[in-house]
Amino acid sequence: MQYKTVAEAKDQPGLRLALTAGGPAPWSQAAKSIFQVKKIPYIPVAQHGGQANEELVAWTGHRNAPVAMYDNEPARTGWYEILMLAERLAPSPSLVPRHVEDRATMIGLSNELCGEEGFTWQARHLMFDTLLKAQGDAFKQNPMYTAYGYSAQNAAAAPSKIKPILAALSARLHKQQGAGSRYFVGNQLTALDLYWANMSQIVDPYPPEKNPMPDFFRQIWAPVRAAVESAIDPILIAHRDFIFAQHLTLPLDF
């Protein structure tokens, strides 16, 4: 992906999207997928994982990614507020169900994947545990080390929190399959399908020809898979592959 710097992008009109450059950071990839499906143009701005990103902080108030900046509106960093921005900018195709029960299901399960203490949050504890064991005190200098509640205790507890989320997702897909649907909610694509397609890379990454990420990511993601492999129902991976085949593009671009 061809990124702009903060200096190049900050005074431009429209949508600017700060994304983690150089690897398939799950939250960044998920945000990209939302805008891709809706065909919303944006200027990609490089955020560098594990670094201070001083210029990004000065512009947006945030060090991490993704950050959506639209015209002169406040920065948006949460998965839900980014999704709502996308829905406003391009109401069709909607990625949010119309019916309240379906919408509540989609938002709830999306938060289990993307929200604080959810699947990806817990997986990050395991990644940080791997990095701390490999790098020792050097990793403690990384600004991410103290930003997301990592501790050895939280890392140890993470698998027991991830597995029920995977179980809920797979149960949902089995129920939908029985009703004749290939999607998590209803009979059409929603944001939840896109979130899982991207977050699933943590526990079952595509091979290099589809996901040409640095080996570093495979090394820190492998322990996550090992810790929760018993909960990875094949229907979850089949669903991920279907979503990429029908709605997204490969190889991943970052």
Predicted features, each with a name:
Residues 85, 172, 242-246:
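C-terminal alpha-helix
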Residues 101, 105-108, 157-164, 168, ...:
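A non-catalytic, amphipathic alpha-helix used as a structural packing/dimerization or gating element
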Residues 89-101, 141-152, 227-238:
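Short secondary-structure transition/capping segments
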Residues 1-140, 247, 251:
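GST-like domain detector, emphasizing the conserved glutathione-binding G-site
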Residues 199-250:
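Short His-centered aromatic/hydrophobic patch
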Residues 115-216:
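GST-like fold's C-terminal all-alpha helical module
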